[in-house]
UniProtKB/Swiss-Prot annotation:
Residues 226-365 form the Helicase ATP-binding domain. Its EC number is 3.6.4.13. Changing V272L: In suv3-1; probably excised introns are less efficiently released. The gene is SUV3. Residues 390-546 form the Helicase C-terminal domain. Keywords: ATP-binding, Helicase, Hydrolase, Mitochondrion, Nucleotide-binding, RNA-binding, Transit peptide. This is ATP-dependent RNA helicase SUV3, mitochondrial. It comes from the Eukaryota. It comes from Saccharomyces cerevisiae (strain ATCC 204508 / S288c) (Baker's yeast). It holds the Pfam family Helicase_C. One of its GO terms (molecular function) is RNA binding. Gene3D superfamilies: 1.20.272.40, 1.20.58.1080, P-loop containing nucleotide triphosphate hydrolases. It is an enzyme of class 3 (hydrolase).
Amino acid sequence: MALVKYSTVFFPLRSLRLFVSIKKAYYHSEPHSIDLFHDKDWIVKRPKFLNLPKNEHSKLDIFQFNFNKSESNNVYLQDSSFKDNLDKAMQFIYNDKLSSLDAKQVPIKNLAWLKLRDYIYQQLKDPKLQAKTYVPSVSEIIHPSSPGNLISLLINCNKISNLVWKSVLKYSLSNNITTLDKFIHVLQQTFDHVYEQEILPMMTNTDDTDGAHNVDITNPAEWFPEARKIRRHIIMHIGPTNSGKTYRALQKLKSVDRGYYAGPLRLLAREVYDRFHAEKIRCNLLTGEEVIRDLDDRGNSAGLTSGTVEMVPINQKFDVVVLDEIQMMSDGDRGWAWTNALLGVVSKEVHLCGEKSVLPLVKSIVKMTGDKLTINEYERLGKLSVEEKPIKDGIKGLRKGDCVVAFSKKKILDLKLKIEKDTNLKVAVIYGSLPPETRVQQAALFNNGEYDIMVASDAIGMGLNLSIDRVVFTTNMKYNGEELMEMTSSQIKQIGGRAGRFKSRSASGGVPQGFITSFESKVLKSVRKAIEAPVEYLKTAVTWPTDEICAQLMTQFPPGTPTSVLLQTISDELEKSSDNLFTLSDLKSKLKVIGLFEHMEDIPFFDKLKLSNAPVKDMPMVTKAFTKFCETIAKRHTRGLLSYRLPFNLLDYNCIPNESYSLEVYESLYNIITLYFWLSNRYPNYFIDMESAKDLKYFCEMIIFEKLDRLKKNPYAHKPFGSTRGHLSSSRRRLRT
């Protein structure tokens, strides 16, 4: 085959065109897909071995580690027990991972072996290795994901109790467990990590990747082979708001040994977690930002877990999984999480709670998967009425128990200030960028009667218990990110249905009733039409390939392909071949996040996929902080949140009355802190000192609450939405002095 030299790499002549396409796509403002699925002769890009002795590059069956006299000050040479265990474990790994391979697998696994040894040499040569102060977490023991911390993990593996180790290794309580057993487990897992995340993504598309490309990318049901091995029972609980759907599903969940509640918000996951514990039912909590394991005296986790839908362990076996708000599977941004969970959870029963609009879509999916389907329909527990006329006298016509709905922070805070100025009513507020804890506080003040009126966005549509008598729509239009659009009947029903939902029975003993109205006749007419409209059935489920499938597909791309190009190409290929049942998740927000770290070459491909799902709010202060966090991952540093140059000096009680520090600054700080928690759960070796982070989070929540309570003027009245640049730069100047 003819070869063309490009820099120091030789490419097949017929592949040069695609290489140039990649270079163009990489530097273009918008990532372009490239036609790679039919051109697969790529040259392997070998990993670099900067610390491995040259004589070991070709000779593989070496299990010991060799150092010169100047490098003798390391644990391997000074601790004979450590040396003996490491040598024996390395020999075991070699025999287990390399000796029994067929000829096609050998070259790739050899590279993983050499890279593993290179990591070990690098750390043993490091005089600044802070191994003795390092305390590994249980998650690091189970699935080590940071080869750069391997030696520290081995040195400190005995800090994890043997009971936990026996659970990890599936030893019986009567069996003894040795340090060598622990070394072997950690090294096996680290070898697999290096092989799958660092070596495979650089390989050619050949048969030596264990059938990685056999997955049918055009059929999402086949992405989850474990779920296809069993015939699951899908049980639907469908009905309007306040019909008891989720309650019935949770009753079933309580009765089993292994189960998962998957909610749309961490606020809801926490609510179920707290409810179970109040009923003396053991339960774990699993959200992107918070993980709480309910352990018994022997270190065994509870069988039930409450969490967010994105965190569902797809391949873990369950008796019951509850997917709440299943109609969210059509959401362009997050719908993939519901769709993938429905297709992929390995559970005897899968309970789906949601609106009737999703029924035909679920029927089609269940027909595709071959599962059994049972449908339970429920009616609303209370009455819901649309008032005949709009409210007289505008704001002065509001009464205690009303919830006024608006769709921007500026409008919501304008309404709060105007209502409190023109009436004697006290106003609580809820909108999407408020911390969940603050939303709970505001809801509690409204529910217990301390505050009279609630002014809120569509954030009240799910996740909060609110004792609303009447929902008052200020408009029937909502900005969708690109243009102002009329709200769908489903959206109006979801919000309007909150009226009367958590009210007790009326004084006369009748069924509790909720009301819907508006300030304007035109809006009220539109709302009534939507409430009375027939069900709008959802037509497509939003999906996206798992990180594992994306990684398998990456082996079909040449080395150095930007992550954004890979994702765009997958999206385009699926759109071409997929039927109308599934559609692809909107890439805009994902690509915007990827753009913050894509240039960082030291972040492995798998980590880039993981980071593309980070909850990064589109606020200048937040995106800058996330970029700094990604640099920490790229450099494999260990840092606490306070070590970053961020304006945490504003988390001071004296700043509360200072109106130059707006709510938005504190909302940005809060999002940075929760982003740090999200990263710490995935990179516990890099992001540490969670106690300080928890304190900062608490202070931030407190100040936001106080800022709302003392609000005298709207901080969004005279500046573009989302701008925190002025506050950030002035705060940084203070931090430098």
